[in-house]
Design a protein with these regions (language model features):
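Start-transfer (signal-anchor) and selected internal transmembrane alpha helices
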Residues: 1-26
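Residue-level signature of transmembrane alpha-helical entry/exit and packing/kink sites
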Residues: 6-14, 100, 104, 125, ...
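Small-residue faces within membrane-embedded alpha-helices
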Residues: 17, 129, 133, 178-179, ...
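Membrane-interface coil-to-helix junctions
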Residues: 20-114, 118, 130-157, 191
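Transmembrane-helix signature of polytopic, membrane-embedded enzymes
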Residues: 115-134, 169-175
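Membrane-embedded translocation segments of transport machinery
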Residues: 157-158, 164
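Short hydrophobic alpha-helices at membrane interfaces in multi-pass membrane enzymes
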Residues: 165-183
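Transmembrane helices and adjacent periplasmic/lumenal helix-loop junctions
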Residues: 180-194
Protein backbone atom coordinates (compact mmCIF):
# COMPACT_ATOMS: atom_id res chain seq x y z
CA UNK A 1 0.00 0.00 0.00
CA UNK A 2 2.89 2.34 0.79
CA UNK A 3 4.34 2.00 -2.73
CA UNK A 4 0.98 2.92 -4.29
CA UNK A 5 0.65 6.07 -2.17
CA UNK A 6 3.98 7.44 -3.37
CA UNK A 7 2.58 7.57 -6.92
CA UNK A 8 -0.72 9.16 -5.92
CA UNK A 9 0.42 12.76 -6.61
CA UNK A 10 1.56 11.75 -10.10
CA UNK A 11 -1.72 9.93 -10.78
CA UNK A 12 -3.66 12.98 -9.62
CA UNK A 13 -1.55 15.20 -11.90
CA UNK A 14 -2.37 12.99 -14.90
CA UNK A 15 -6.08 13.10 -14.03
CA UNK A 16 -5.84 16.87 -13.63
CA UNK A 17 -4.30 17.10 -17.11
CA UNK A 18 -7.22 15.14 -18.56
CA UNK A 19 -9.71 17.44 -16.80
CA UNK A 20 -7.88 20.58 -17.98
CA UNK A 21 -7.78 19.25 -21.54
CA UNK A 22 -11.50 18.44 -21.51
CA UNK A 23 -12.32 21.82 -19.95
CA UNK A 24 -10.37 23.71 -22.60
CA UNK A 25 -12.18 21.97 -25.46
CA UNK A 26 -15.47 21.56 -23.55
CA UNK A 27 -17.84 23.40 -25.92
CA UNK A 28 -16.55 21.55 -28.96
CA UNK A 29 -16.64 18.17 -27.22
CA UNK A 30 -20.16 18.54 -25.84
CA UNK A 31 -21.77 20.17 -28.88
CA UNK A 32 -19.98 17.92 -31.35
CA UNK A 33 -18.40 20.88 -33.10
CA UNK A 34 -15.40 20.28 -35.32
CA UNK A 35 -12.41 22.57 -35.53
CA UNK A 36 -11.73 23.29 -39.20
CA UNK A 37 -8.02 22.81 -39.84
CA UNK A 38 -6.80 23.92 -43.23
CA UNK A 39 -3.68 21.75 -43.33
CA UNK A 40 -5.60 18.65 -42.26
CA UNK A 41 -8.16 19.29 -44.96
CA UNK A 42 -5.46 19.86 -47.58
CA UNK A 43 -3.64 16.73 -46.41
CA UNK A 44 -6.76 14.64 -46.87
CA UNK A 45 -7.07 16.06 -50.36
CA UNK A 46 -3.46 15.22 -51.18
CA UNK A 47 -3.93 11.67 -49.91
CA UNK A 48 -7.26 11.09 -51.64
CA UNK A 49 -5.76 9.42 -54.70
CA UNK A 50 -3.80 6.88 -52.66
CA UNK A 51 -6.78 6.25 -50.34
CA UNK A 52 -9.07 5.61 -53.31
CA UNK A 53 -6.46 3.29 -54.81
CA UNK A 54 -6.25 1.35 -51.54
CA UNK A 55 -10.05 1.11 -51.29
CA UNK A 56 -10.28 -0.09 -54.90
CA UNK A 57 -7.39 -2.60 -54.93
CA UNK A 58 -6.52 -3.33 -51.30
CA UNK A 59 -2.91 -2.48 -52.10
CA UNK A 60 -0.87 0.40 -50.75
CA UNK A 61 0.65 2.71 -53.32
CA UNK A 62 3.90 4.47 -52.58
CA UNK A 63 3.45 7.14 -55.26
CA UNK A 64 0.84 9.75 -56.07
CA UNK A 65 0.48 11.77 -59.22
CA UNK A 66 -1.84 14.33 -57.65
CA UNK A 67 0.74 16.40 -55.77
CA UNK A 68 3.62 18.34 -57.35
CA UNK A 69 3.30 16.29 -60.57
CA UNK A 70 4.10 13.19 -58.57
CA UNK A 71 5.72 12.38 -55.24
CA UNK A 72 6.11 9.53 -52.72
CA UNK A 73 3.21 8.99 -50.33
CA UNK A 74 5.26 8.22 -47.21
CA UNK A 75 4.80 11.81 -45.98
CA UNK A 76 1.21 12.26 -47.14
CA UNK A 77 -0.66 9.06 -46.31
CA UNK A 78 1.74 6.63 -44.69
CA UNK A 79 0.42 3.07 -44.37
CA UNK A 80 2.76 0.46 -42.97
CA UNK A 81 1.81 -2.86 -41.40
CA UNK A 82 4.57 -2.31 -38.86
CA UNK A 83 2.68 0.64 -37.37
CA UNK A 84 -0.22 -1.46 -36.09
CA UNK A 85 1.33 -2.45 -32.76
CA UNK A 86 2.74 1.03 -32.17
CA UNK A 87 -0.63 2.61 -32.95
CA UNK A 88 -2.16 0.62 -30.09
CA UNK A 89 0.55 1.81 -27.68
CA UNK A 90 0.11 5.43 -28.82
CA UNK A 91 -3.65 5.14 -28.29
CA UNK A 92 -3.08 3.87 -24.75
CA UNK A 93 -0.79 6.85 -24.06
CA UNK A 94 -3.55 9.17 -25.31
CA UNK A 95 -5.97 7.44 -22.87
CA UNK A 96 -8.57 7.16 -25.63
CA UNK A 97 -9.36 10.86 -25.31
CA UNK A 98 -11.12 12.70 -28.16
CA UNK A 99 -8.87 14.20 -30.81
CA UNK A 100 -8.52 17.83 -29.70
CA UNK A 101 -8.45 16.82 -26.05
CA UNK A 102 -5.59 14.35 -26.43
CA UNK A 103 -3.46 16.89 -28.29
CA UNK A 104 -3.45 19.13 -25.24
CA UNK A 105 -3.24 16.17 -22.86
CA UNK A 106 -0.05 14.81 -24.44
CA UNK A 107 1.53 18.28 -24.34
CA UNK A 108 0.82 18.39 -20.61
CA UNK A 109 1.82 14.81 -19.84
CA UNK A 110 4.98 14.84 -21.95
CA UNK A 111 6.40 17.96 -20.34
CA UNK A 112 5.40 16.62 -16.92
CA UNK A 113 7.38 13.43 -17.54
CA UNK A 114 10.44 15.48 -18.49
CA UNK A 115 10.20 17.76 -15.44
CA UNK A 116 9.79 14.78 -13.12
CA UNK A 117 12.92 13.26 -14.70
CA UNK A 118 14.67 16.49 -13.71
CA UNK A 119 13.44 15.81 -10.13
CA UNK A 120 10.94 18.67 -10.02
CA UNK A 121 8.37 18.33 -7.27
CA UNK A 122 4.99 17.12 -8.46
CA UNK A 123 3.19 20.45 -8.11
CA UNK A 124 5.99 22.37 -9.87
CA UNK A 125 6.12 19.82 -12.68
CA UNK A 126 2.33 20.08 -13.09
CA UNK A 127 2.44 23.88 -13.07
CA UNK A 128 5.33 23.94 -15.54
CA UNK A 129 3.44 21.56 -17.81
CA UNK A 130 0.39 23.82 -17.85
CA UNK A 131 2.50 26.88 -18.62
CA UNK A 132 4.34 25.06 -21.41
CA UNK A 133 1.27 23.42 -22.97
CA UNK A 134 -0.70 26.66 -23.07
CA UNK A 135 1.99 28.65 -24.82
CA UNK A 136 0.35 30.18 -27.86
CA UNK A 137 2.26 28.33 -30.57
CA UNK A 138 1.10 24.89 -29.47
CA UNK A 139 -2.55 25.90 -29.65
CA UNK A 140 -2.06 27.72 -32.96
CA UNK A 141 -0.64 24.63 -34.66
CA UNK A 142 -3.59 22.56 -33.43
CA UNK A 143 -5.95 25.09 -35.01
CA UNK A 144 -3.89 25.22 -38.21
CA UNK A 145 -3.97 21.45 -38.54
CA UNK A 146 -0.25 20.75 -38.20
CA UNK A 147 -1.16 17.57 -36.37
CA UNK A 148 2.01 15.59 -37.06
CA UNK A 149 3.98 18.56 -35.76
CA UNK A 150 1.74 18.61 -32.67
CA UNK A 151 2.58 14.96 -32.01
CA UNK A 152 6.30 15.41 -32.67
CA UNK A 153 6.51 18.38 -30.29
CA UNK A 154 4.45 16.60 -27.64
CA UNK A 155 6.67 13.50 -27.67
CA UNK A 156 9.98 15.40 -27.58
CA UNK A 157 10.03 16.40 -23.85
CA UNK A 158 9.47 12.86 -22.51
CA UNK A 159 12.14 11.57 -24.90
CA UNK A 160 14.54 14.11 -23.36
CA UNK A 161 13.27 13.02 -19.94
CA UNK A 162 14.29 9.44 -20.74
CA UNK A 163 17.80 10.57 -21.61
CA UNK A 164 17.96 12.49 -18.32
CA UNK A 165 16.87 9.37 -16.42
CA UNK A 166 19.68 7.39 -18.04
CA UNK A 167 22.23 10.07 -17.13
CA UNK A 168 20.98 9.94 -13.54
CA UNK A 169 21.74 6.23 -13.33
CA UNK A 170 18.21 4.93 -13.89
CA UNK A 171 19.35 3.02 -16.94
CA UNK A 172 16.37 0.73 -17.49
CA UNK A 173 13.81 3.49 -17.01
CA UNK A 174 15.90 5.76 -19.19
CA UNK A 175 16.13 3.13 -21.91
CA UNK A 176 12.41 2.39 -21.75
CA UNK A 177 11.23 6.02 -21.78
CA UNK A 178 13.73 7.12 -24.44
CA UNK A 179 12.95 4.14 -26.67
CA UNK A 180 9.20 4.51 -26.31
CA UNK A 181 9.12 8.20 -27.13
CA UNK A 182 11.70 7.88 -29.88
CA UNK A 183 9.34 5.37 -31.48
CA UNK A 184 6.47 7.82 -30.95
CA UNK A 185 8.56 10.57 -32.60
CA UNK A 186 9.15 8.41 -35.65
CA UNK A 187 5.47 7.47 -35.63
CA UNK A 188 4.58 11.19 -35.69
CA UNK A 189 6.14 11.27 -39.18
CA UNK A 190 7.34 14.87 -39.03
CA UNK A 191 10.94 14.79 -40.18
CA UNK A 192 11.68 18.48 -39.52
CA UNK A 193 10.57 18.27 -35.89
CA UNK A 194 11.80 14.79 -35.07
Amino acid sequence: MKNWKQYLPDILAVLLFAVISFAYFFPADIDGKVLYRHDSSAGRGMGLESSEYYDRTGEVTRWTGSVFCGMPTYQITPRYKSLTALTDVVDIYHLGLPENVWFLFVYLLGFYIMLRAFNFKTYLAALGSVVWAFSSYFLIIIAAGHLWKVMALAYLPPMIGGIVLAYRGKYLWGLFVTSLFTAFEIYANHVQMT
